[in-house]
Structure formats: C-alpha cells, structure tokens
C-alpha cells in the first residue's frame, strides 16, 4: 500500500526550531516524514535544513493570512502534483484555507491545534478574543478532523465548540529522550554550573526557561520576583534561580539582573546543560492553555519539577512518579516550601511510562492512524 501523502501548512516561523512550540511542530513533521510522504508549505521567513522532506517557504504569516489567497492555485497545483491525500494545517488561524483547498481539491484537512487560541488571546486581553473564539469553534467544526495537544483541550473543545468526539484526537508534544539520564552526567553538569557561575557547591540550583515575551511566561517572571524570592530568602539557605529564554524586553533584563539570587542567562545554545545540572525545575505558570513543553522537556531529563496545577495540564501525574510536584494555583507559600524541601531530596527516576506516553514515534503513529482512515475514505 502506498504511503499517505501529507501537505502541511505552517503560517508562522518554525525553522530553525528554537522555542518549544517550534520544536513541537518541527519534531512532529520530522517523525511523520519517516512514515509518510511529506511536503510543507511554510511562511517565507523559515529556513529549513530538512533533507528527508520538501519544505517550500512562500506563504505569508497568518497575521496577513488572507494575502495567501494569491497562492491558492499554487497550493491546488501542489496538491495535484504531489498526489496529496490529506492537508494538515498548524493552528486554527489558517483553517479557512483548509476549507477552500478541500473545495478545490476534494482533499480532507486536519487542524493541528497546539492550544485553545481564544484562551491565549483572552489572557493577553485582546479586545476581539470572543470573535476569535467564535471563529475557532466554527473552523474546527468545518475540519474533517482536529488534533488537540492535550486531553483537557480536547474535552473543552468538544463541550464548548460542540465537536464530534470521533473527529478529535489528542496528539501531544513529544520528548526527544527515551530514558532517564545517567546520574553521573547530572553530577558533572551540576559541577559545571557551579564552577562557571562561581557558586558555593552547597547552592541549590533552580531553573525556569521559556519564550519570555509570551504572557504566561512573563507572568511567571513576575511571580518569581514578587511572590517567591522573599519567601525563599526567609528560609535562609543558599540558592540561585537560572532564567533562560529569548525574546525578552530590555526592561525585564534590567529587572532580573538587579536580583543577586537570579542568574539571567538569556537564550542559551545548550539548554540541556541546565536541565541536567539544576536541582529542580520550577513552573509557576497559571495562564494559558495547551501544554507546557518546557515541563515535558525537564521531566524527560529526569528533573524534579514543581508546577502550579494549571501549568501541568496535559501531563498525567500517574506517569511522573515523584518527579512532578503539583501546587494549587496561587499558593505561592506552598510553592516556595516545596522548592526548599524537594530540591534537596533524592528521588526515583521518572517512570518508563512517561517516556512511552511522550514518545514521538508513538505520537506520530497515532496521527498516522487517523490520516490512513481519512485517506481510505477519500
């Protein structure tokens, strides 16, 4: 039987993949390309080095989405030339394009959602977020199938957007690592961080990272400074909080660098050093939907993680063992207490069930099963 042929449409910058959301899209398609013929039509600013599938950077960013109408017949021609079976559109922004392409090509389309976008707009206080919520529900209802990043998002969309459960599937973010790290590697990385930053070996090392102009992460910076620092300092122990990430304002850089207990690193080429070397990853995030990719990455590195309950949506606690500690939203005293106690404990490694659940090959196989059914019906 011929492999399914998929056209992915990505209306934002993904390549080179640096941030969690970008890595999620790039890794999904790189694993999909092992089992399917893949062509990506992407936004013009993308620079891809992929050599196992075709990447065509000619689309406008979704902020100028309707300008892509000029490429509608180019896309139809591409679908015909490449014998495309299924169209996969990243995020709901360009879902309307999927409707047009289905009408022109008779090919079904999937919306690959990475969060409930209307919730993100609401949290950002966008004045038209309710308009987008109406559009998001409408376009998911028109799609032949919808992939959601978490069970929570899927259940919410089924209830509020009145979608058919049979046309919805959880396709989550995956981890690159397949098993816990060797303990010696963690010790070596910790020693490196201590030496490079001229710290006392007894210093407990915490880590927070992310795209720092993204509202949930910016709010987490505020929480670290206004809610956690004083509570930690009151416990009178040596600690430092590493903050890594890109797209941060000059004002925020100045603020972070004014606190001696915070070590602001900005964007780092090798975030794995910090995942391996820190004693504890913190996720004081309460805003946003979707899934916190940094939390999955940290757990994959066998890192002890403390998270606000809302920030851990999409990660079943039963597969994380002792390594994921959940604190009720806005209980910052409880959060600081756990930072003090958990960072000094020796815990069992992340269970094998975690690596199975967040294994990219298994995630993509689930998506392929849906694509195969859609292909057979077309």
Regions found by a protein language model. Give the residues of each.
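Acidic donor-binding loop of glycosyltransferase active sites
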Residues: 144, 261, 276-290, 301-303
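Conserved catalytic-core segment of nucleotide-activated headgroup transferases in glycan assembly
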Residues: 24-30, 175-255, 264, 268-269
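Short hydrophobic beta-strand element within catalytic cores of glycosyltransferases
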Residues: 294-297, 304-309
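Active-site proximal beta-strand in glycosyltransferases
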Residues: 7, 102-121
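Membrane-proximal helix-turn-helix segments that form the acceptor-binding/catalytic region
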Residues: 73-77, 103, 127-149
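N-terminal subdomain of nucleotide-sugar transferases
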Residues: 1-47, 82, 234
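A charged, aromatic-enriched C-terminal amphipathic alpha-helix characteristic of glycosyltransferases
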Residues: 344-375
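Carbohydrate-associated surface elements
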Residues: 152, 171-174
């Amino acid at each position: 039987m011929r492999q399914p042929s998929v056209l992915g449409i990505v209306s934002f910058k993904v390549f080179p993949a640096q941030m969690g959301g970008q890595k999620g899209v790039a890794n999904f398609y790189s694993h999909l390309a092992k089992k399917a013929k893949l062509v990506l039509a992407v936004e013009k600013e993308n620079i891809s080095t992929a050599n196992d599938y075709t990447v065509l950077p000619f689309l406008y960013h979704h902020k100028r989405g309707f300008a892509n109408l000029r490429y509608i017949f180019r896309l139809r021609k591409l679908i015909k030339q490449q014998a495309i079976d299924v169209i996969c559109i990243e995020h709901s922004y360009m879902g309307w394009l999927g409707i047009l392409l289905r009408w022109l090509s008779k090919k079904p389309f999937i919306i690959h959602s990475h969060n409930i976008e209307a919730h993100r707009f609401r949290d950002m206080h966008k004045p038209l977020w309710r308009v987008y919520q109406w559009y998001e529900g409408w376009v998911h209802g028109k799609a032949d199938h919808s992939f959601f990043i978490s069970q929570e998002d899927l259940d919410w969309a089924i209830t509020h957007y009145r979608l058919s459960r049979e046309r919805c599937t959880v396709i989550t973010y995956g981890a690159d690592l397949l098993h816990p790290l060797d303990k010696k590697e963690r010790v070596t990385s910790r020693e490196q961080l201590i030496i490079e930053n001229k710290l006392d070996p007894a210093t407990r090392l915490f880590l927070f990272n992310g795209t720092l102009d993204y509202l949930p992460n910016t709010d987490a910076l505020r929480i670290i400074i206004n809610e956690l620092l004083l509570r930690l300092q009151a416990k009178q122990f040596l600690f430092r909080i590493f903050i890594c990430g890109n797209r941060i304002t000059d004002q925020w850089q100045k603020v972070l660098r004014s606190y001696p207990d915070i070590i602001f690193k900005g964007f780092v080429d090798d975030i794995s050093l910090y995942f391996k070397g820190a004693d504890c990853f913190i996720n004081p995030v309460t805003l946003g939907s979707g899934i916190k990719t940094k939390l999955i990455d940290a757990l994959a590195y066998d890192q002890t993680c403390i998270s606000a309950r809302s920030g851990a949506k999409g990660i079943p606690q039963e597969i994380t063992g002792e390594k994921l500690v959940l604190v009720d939203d806005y209980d910052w005293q409880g959060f600081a207490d756990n930072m003090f106690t958990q960072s000094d404990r020796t815990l069992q490694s992340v269970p094998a069930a975690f690596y199975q659940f967040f294994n990219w090959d298994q995630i993509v196989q689930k998506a392929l099963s849906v694509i195969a059914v859609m292909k057979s019906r077309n």
